[in-house]
From Swiss-Prot:
pH dependency: Optimum pH is approximately 8.0.
The keyword S-adenosyl-L-methionine belongs to this UniProt entry's keyword annotation: no
Pfam families: EryCIII-like_C (PF06722)
Protein name: NDP-glycosyltransferase YjiC
Species of the source: Bacillus subtilis (strain 168)
Annotated GO biological process: antibiotic biosynthetic process
SUPFAM superfamilies: UDP-Glycosyltransferase/glycogen phosphorylase (SSF53756)
Organism taxonomic ancestry: Bacteria, Bacillati, Bacillota, Bacilli, Bacillales
Effect noted on mutating residue 16 to A: Drastic loss of activity for both pterostilbene glycosylation and UDP glycosylation
Length: 392
């Protein structure tokens, strides 16, 4: 097999970078050179996976409070469009004497798609969320309205700056190969997706920064509570969880994020362990239930571990996942505005006592394990390159 220079281009967000790291590792193990355009924050993780981190600078802020504000104001579409234009010249500079044989870009990293078009090299799309095709598109009416408004404003900006036309519609167009980090059975309208889409399930690998489990698992059932890395600035929620499960039969591990000091949550019960972050993959291996925001990584990690969910979505895409979890009978959807001490207790009781639900979770776990993960994704990439007849 020929060895290639593969460029990965992503946005600076854990939910988009983390699924790619095991894939980077597999490609490097197979002898390919992987350069990864990212920000300083993610460079160590890329390097630990065996890739070369090429640093670009961005105005996108991944601070949880800023993200929450951006989503509430619906500023995300315009921010992502403008960001793609600021990153493109940086990519040109980073790769000016080192052109890749292949570009792999995340499904919202528009700069990656534009850069591939400019270089006229083969391109593959990674979907860390739901894949899109001619039948299924991400976006509710409110979001599409905001995108149209953003694109109108953006078009005027492009004309003023004499820049080429760029549109969100470009991101919805499938590539010849699209790698999707979920099993096909979890994809919405999965029956409409053809063989351009390779559903490999979560690309997990071993997290290099893995730490030891915070507590020893005893005979009590173990509950993990986490709202992920981006939407966790919600102290009232954590206080409700403490009230709901104080001195209960549950052993609880709760991750509250970087913006909240665990010590600020007063009178922590003996059955709670609260940290700003926890080794989620390791905890899920021993967990019996997961209260989650419904981010795709967390959802897939739960299914990989065979753990049922109570999903409290914080944004539109997570609402889709909460609905999908509910529709497939893998857990309970608890809307954010309906979260109370009693609704948390009721949701947990409903999930933990439903043996048929637990059986469906085990079936989805089987789908996840059989999807192939990073190993299959790497093999599909090599087959694609062979078919593309890219010279060495």
């Amino acid at each position: 097999m020929k060895k290639y220079h593969i460029s990965m281009i992503n946005i600076p967000a854990y939910g988009h970078v983390n699924p790619t790291l095991a894939l980077v590792e597999k490609l490097c193990e197979k002898g390919h050179r992987v350069t990864y355009a990212t920000t300083e924050e993610f460079a160590p993780a890329v390097q630990q996976a065996g890739g070369e981190a090429l640093i670009y600078h961005t105005s996108l802020n991944i601070d949880p409070k800023q993200i929450r504000e951006m989503m509430e104001k619906n500023d995300a579409p315009l921010s992502l469009l403008k960001e793609s234009l600021s990153i493109l010249p940086q990519l040109e500079e980073l790769y000016k004497d080192d052109q890749p044989d292949l570009i792999i870009y995340d499904f919202v990293a528009l700069a990656g798609k534009l850069f591939a078009e400019k270089l006229n090299v083969p391109v593959i799309k990674l979907c860390s969320s739901y894949a899109q095709n001619e039948s299924f598109q991400l976006g509710n009416e409110d979001m599409l309205k905001k995108i149209r408004e953003a694109e109108a404003e953006f078009k005027a900006y492009l004309e003023q700056e004499k820049l080429p036309a760029v549109s969100f519609e470009q991101l919805a167009v499938p590539e010849a190969l699209n790698i999707v980090f979920m099993p096909k059975s979890f994809q919405i309208q999965h029956e409409t997706f053809d063989d351009r889409f390779c559903f490999v399930g979560p690309s997990l690998g071993e997290r290099k920064e893995k730490e030891s489990l915070l507590i020893d698992k005893d005979d009590r059932p173990l509950m993990l509570i986490s709202l992920g890395t981006a939407f966790n600035a919600w102290p009232e929620f954590y206080k409700m969880c403490i009230k709901a499960f104080r001195d209960s039969s549950w052993q609880v591990i709760m991750s509250v994020g970087k913006t909240i000091d665990p010590e600020s949550l007063e009178d922590i019960p003996a059955n709670f362990t609260i940290r700003q972050s926890v080794p989620q993959l390791e905890v899920l291996e021993k967990a019996d239930l997961f209260i989650s925001h419904g981010g795709m990584n967390s959802t897939m990690e739960a299914m990989n571990a065979g753990v049922p969910l109570v999903v409290i979505p914080q944004m539109y895409e997570q609402e889709l996942t909460a609905n999908r979890v509910d529709e497939l009978g893998l857990g309970v959807y608890l809307p954010k505005e309906e979260v109370t001490v009693s609704s948390l207790q009721e949701a947990v009781q409903a999930v933990s006592s439903d043996q048929e639900l637990l059986s469906r979770v085990k079936n989805m776990q089987k789908d996840v394990k059989e999807a192939g993960g990073a190993e299959r994704a790497a093999a599909e990439i090599e087959a694609f390159m062979k078919k593309s007849a890219v010279p060495q």
